[in-house]
């Protein structure tokens, strides 16, 4: 089991899943810009620009995290070869538009395999290979969609809610012995949001999201939630009585 002993940022290594597009790729770019070595893991390397692939400080690892057997072996090998990894950003996720009337079990399984179970797989391998302490950062990418049940989010929302609970559970167990970060973005321009037909308030670019995350990930605090005020509005929904909450959702998302 490896201990983190690297103090020079030039020697630090960050491990990022879901690294081929959206926030994941933007985080790879931001960490490279900050001088880190980056290990980016994703199922598709064709989306990553050649200039990033050719960067000597970037290593791409191709695997489909929903294929647990092959991913377990691949990630285990990566961790064994990279003792200086000090930050783990578990960002892999998929989004399938869904509602009660059109969802099916296959889509539900695909969503939870990637969005939830792949995170558990990564964490199992992290704790196996590293002696986690306050020098390490474990960041879990959830979403403001996980704060409360929303119409037409019967798969994605619950998967992100599970990650919020998971991050809270790890933090409540580790306290200050591990820098645990829960990341809950609002609407970000990603392949996932491109399929949405509804208005997305405070939509922001992945690059801006990555800058916010990097600016806060090593500071005090547990949750990185943005943008304001959208995140505050979504958080407010968590404390509303159900009767009032459902009246609001009925008004805002009424059937047409």
What name fits each language-model region?
Residues 91-96:
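Conserved NAD(P)H cofactor-binding loop of Rossmann-fold oxidoreductase domains
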Residues 123, 159:
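Active-site helix of classical SDR
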Residues 34-49:
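Conserved glycine-rich Rossmann-like NAD(P)H-binding loop of the short-chain dehydrogenase/reductase
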Residues 20-21:
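Conserved glycine-rich cofactor-binding loop
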Residues 143:
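Residue(s) in the substrate-gating loop at a strand-loop-helix junction
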Residues 182, 198-234:
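C-terminal helical subdomain
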Residues 99-100, 104-112:
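Substrate-binding pocket helix/loop in short-chain dehydrogenase/reductase
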